[in-house]
Amino acid sequence: MRTGHERVGVAEFVPEVNFIRTIDIHHNYAACEEHFGKKVFVHRKGATSAKLDEIGIIPGSMGAASYIVRGLGNPDSFMSCSHGAGRRMSRIAASTTLTVEECDRAMDGIVCERWHKYKGYGKAKGKLDLSEAPQAYKDIEDVIASERDLVEPLVRLVPLASLKG
């Protein structure tokens, strides 16, 4: 759950920003819901609710667009959709196979902290952590296209800056 501090942080750098609505959703949770005439627990792991007319967000990678969406309430998906583009490669694979140069090119024009040393263990230890690089994720446009029966895209958001905290 957000506390409102993120609004203060954004307003500090962009004072003219006007927050109309906050979209705050979870992507790993279980909820008691009614589906097919029965009360059931729906466990959404990397997914989020997409009930009829419910507003949500499907984020892309730090270098790709994100989408504000409206749920279509598709019962076949238990009224769910993906929460994000999803990984194309594991964190370790990204940090051991991608190069800083290609990751920097993918982030060209987007304000962000550049890559830090990997804090994990094994093959990636001591290398730069490229695990969140855009190339590690699926193409958000393909993801949105594949979910047209689950959500209606309302707004396409293009990243200007990427903050990690």
Where are these regions (language model features)?
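Domain-length cofactor-binding catalytic modules of enzymes
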Residues: 1-165
